[in-house]
Amino acid sequence: MKLKSIIIATVGLLLATGCNSQNKQVKQTNMGKSIVIFFSHAGDNYAVGNIEVGNTKIVADYISEIIGTDQFEIVTHKYDGMAYAPLINLAKEETRKGELPEYEGDVDLSQYDTVFIGGPVWWGTYPQVMFTFFKKHANDLKGKTIIPFTTHEGSGLANCVEDVKAAFAGANVTKGFSIYGHEVRTEKTKVEKWLKGLGY
């Protein structure tokens, strides 16, 4: 009788574990296959000084680590080695003129259901090189979910969500997430909380 009770308890535990694993899998995949598209600026930055890894890349890496997304980094060498003040002046001119700097490589977005889009806030929106990417892929995200995020030092999301909505007509653009650049190295829990709120 004792052996029978042990067997029944063991089977029940295995079934419960299996159900929990199945529920966890559903939770992880209910947003479909995901990718993080981001631009990040290393080097001289406001509030954090000269950094080897850009603030936005740190957040992108958190997202990939926590929920297992792919990544595509929008890379341009136009700003390499620039001090913060001249960089921001250049960014202001690019924004004013609507310039579209070139970036390296590309990505096939057809396989993804959810796309995280992130970058720093420069003059009220994302850096112009991101708009180069937006223009190239303007018709690739119809019916997909876009989740914007920003790193900043006081601008929050600025106009980034509105600009993403304008760039990708027909996509489901969420309200977005922002975090201070000087916090990203110590506040991973904020990213975790945000992702948990999204259902991950």
Regions found by a protein language model. Name each.
Residues 41-44, 76-80, 121-125, 152-157, ...:
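Solvent-exposed loop/turn segments at secondary-structure junctions
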Residues 53, 57, 61, 127, ...:
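Short, surface-exposed alpha-helical segments at coil->helix boundaries
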Residues 35-38, 71-73, 115-118, 147-150, ...:
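Structural recognition of the beta-strand scaffold that forms the well-ordered cores
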Residues 20-113, 190-200:
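N-terminal beta1-alpha1-beta2 submodule of the flavodoxin-like/Rossmannoid cofactor-binding fold
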Residues 82-170:
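Helix-loop-strand module that forms the ligand-binding subsite of alpha/beta enzymes
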Residues 151-168, 172-190, 198-199:
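Contiguous ligand/interfacial binding patches
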Residues 1-7:
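Bacterial N-terminal signal peptides that target proteins for export
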Residues 15-18:
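C-terminal motif of bacterial Sec signal peptides marking the signal peptidase cleavage site
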